[in-house]
Structures are given as C-alpha cells and as structure tokens.
Design a protein with these regions (language model features):
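Alpha/beta-hydrolase superfamily serine-hydrolase fold, recognizing
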Residues: 1-192
C-alpha cells in the first residue's frame, strides 16, 4: 500500500474509534519505527483537519524522516542489529514510489507540530533512528508540545518490545503504562 494509503486508513480507523466507542480523552495513539512515523503523521493530519486529538501519543524508535539524512543511520550502523540504511532506502522506494520524501504526510518531522497532545518518545543510544527521535523532540518542544524523551543507554531499535527477556524493556513498558495512565485517567491522579 503506497503512500498515503496507510495514513488514509489510520485516519478512517481513528475517526471510527472516536465516533463509535471511546472518547478521545481515553485514547492514546502509539507506534514503533515506521508505525511511530505513521502515528505522528496521523496526529498532524487530525490537527490540520480540525479533528479532536487523542489524549496522548507514545512513539517508540520513531521513523519520522524519509529523506534519510540523519547521521545516526551511519554512526550507529554497527550498533543497531535491526535497522540499516539499505533496508530503509528499500522501504522508502516501495512506500513513496517517487513521491516527495519531505512531504509531511510521509515524513512528519517536516509537519507543523504545534497543538499536538503530550508525547512520549523512547529511543536507544544505539538506535539507527536516534537522530529522528532527538530532532523530533527538539522540534516538538519548540512547537509547544509537552514532550518527554527517554534515551536508553546502549539500547537499539524498538528495544521496548523485548520485555520478555530485557530488563530495560520492562522498565520502558512500565514508563509507557505510567504515561498513558497519567494522560487518560486524570481523576486517578488528583490530590483532592
């Protein structure tokens, strides 16, 4: 499904969810790697369309820049067993099929981030997409987004999904849970 099919599907699914089941105050958008980029593209598209946004977002090792200009793609090539420039180039070609890699719907790092919900970004120091995550953090912060960046020492791409055997991943899952609870159940955290 070439660009923008995934984003169109995500918009349809989110709008259906909010209409039929859960108010956005109880909804969190999350994604990892390309899914993290898609989650961010969804948020920026919803905001641009004037839709109500979810309560928060969680982005794990987000791939948010399909121009592939991040230095960490090369600097961390020997440290990240899951992500390679060659693999990402292949994915960009298949997904964009000649479309502009700077299009905000494909590379949400280039989108207007103002007005987005509180966002948790998790990335490892050995992740080839480290620069995508840190640049996103900086741009989101400058746009006024309440963003939290967790850069885990010596962790690689998508490390939080390895919670069955990696203690650092279990800590990340706990952090994600606390973040989600804090933003979806505010009455549970009141001091009154």
């Amino acid at each position: 499904h070439p660009h923008p099919a995934a984003l169109d599907d995500a918009l349809t699914a989110y709008r259906w969810l909010v209409e039929t089941t859960s108010p956005q105050a109880h909804t969190v958008v999350a994604g990892e790697s390309a899914g993290g980029g898609l989650a961010l593209a969804l948020l920026t598209a919803l905001h641009a369309a004037g839709d109500d946004l979810p309560a928060a977002a969680v982005l794990i090792s987000p791939w948010v820049d399909m121009t592939l200009t991040a230095a960490s793609l090369d600097d961390r090539a020997d440290l990240d067993p899951f992500t390679s420039r060659a693999g990402l180039e292949m994915n960009v070609g298949a997904y964009l099929q000649g479309q502009d890699p700077k299009a905000p719907s494909a590379s949400p790092l280039f989108a207007d981030l103002a007005g987005l919900p509180p966002t948790l970004i998790l990335v490892g120091t050995n992740d080839a997409l480290l620069d995508d995550a840190t640049r996103l953090n900086d741009l989101a912060r400058r746009a006024g987004v309440a963003v939290t960046l967790n850069v885990a020492d010596e962790m690689y791409h998508m490390w939080p999904i390895m919670s069955s055997f990696l203690p650092e991943a279990r800590q990340a899952v706990q952090e994600i849970g606390e973040f989600v609870r804090a933003h979806t159940n505010p009455s549970d955290h009141s001091t009154d």
